Curated annotation (Swiss-Prot):
It is found in: Virion. One of its GO terms (biological process) is virion attachment to host cell pilus. Interacts with the host pilus. One of its GO terms (molecular function) is RNA binding. During internalization, MP is proteolytically cleaved into two fragments allowing translation and replication to start. Pfam families: Phage_mat-A (PF03863). GO terms for cellular component: virion component. Its main location: virion. It comes from the Viruses. The gene is A. This is Maturation protein A. Keywords: Host-virus interaction, RNA-binding, Viral attachment to host cell, Viral attachment to host cell pilus, Viral genome circularization, Viral penetration into host cytoplasm, Virion, Virus entry into host cell. Residues 26-233 are annotated as: Viral RNA-binding.
Amino acid sequence: MRKFIPTERMSKSHVVSVREYADGELEDNSLPLIYRSNWSPGQYTSTGPRTKEWHYPSSYSRGAIGIKALDQGKYARLGTSWGREFEERAGYGMSIDARSCYSLFPVSQNLTWIDVPTNVANRATTEVLGKVTQGNFNLGVALAEARSTASQLSTQTIALIKAYTAARRGNWRQALRYLALNENRKFNSKSVASRWLELQFGWMPLLSDIQGAYEMLTKVHLKAFMPMRAVRQVGQNVSLSGRLTSPAASYKSTCNISRRIVIWFYINDARLAWLSSLGILNPLGIVWEKVPFSFLVDWLLPVGNMLEGLTAPIGCSYQSGTVTDVISGESTITADDIYGWDTVRPATAKVQISAVHRGVQSVWPTTGVYVKSPFSMVHTLDALALFRQRLWK
């Protein structure tokens, strides 16, 4: 995305106007045209409150509109003046102010509001709640099993030490017992090295269990206050077209609009959060999964995701969040034909926009209805795989 100059800038465009008479006389009335080529409404930033352990996010808005290129075109006509024939070539004389070009895009005049498509907005809110559920599952499982994990770690570590001590003393039967292997096992070699290699089949699983238990305990070692974060960004290409009255012209705009939602939350009830992540607290989701061929509906209209989002906040407390809307795009303005003139090349202007607005959200977002694009290749392959899986069950 091109970076625009954040301050205003004036530019100059040369408008040709030359009349050539039949007797060879030239009359040049060309002139420069000054226009505002860059405009920015300025930056808006607010400072979020700060506590001992948390700095709340702040709102801000930035944007700029720039006229990338202005071509006055080429027009020609034949005529007479006081009985003298002439051929005249001229430019359109199009004058554009970057401040008025906001109307070419789905934004407000001061660029602090972006018209995000409803489908994008609903998908972002629904899927970010799904991210919250995934976070609940990962941390909820860890918290719920932390106590048993600690006990398991100590038991396995003691078993490892005892097995190691027995092996060093040559008491292989006792070592096998600690490693939960068959103590009546007969070795093919009497050498200590061969016996040790055969015991690897018992050592390795035990060491793996100890490492896994240790990692789980270190991951769930939480501070008194530790917010988690869920993020989802969704974008869509948008095309617009319309008419202008001054100058008399048509325009076509293409832009990309995206919404990024960030939620900071913390789990205040690990058991409820875990149950919510498993879908146990949402009977509607369970019933929907049992509906025959519901996955075909989910392919286009993800009802399952929307139902899942209804119970995502259970067991969690909302801390803060932001909604960031971004637009970047380009518009082409094409002037209408001029009456009485032949259009050799129409006058055109290319306008670019780049704007971002972030607002602070103080409550949980709510799910909404959205439609997935059925033309995505990955989406289509996923649906075919699901269809085959369900059909051959």
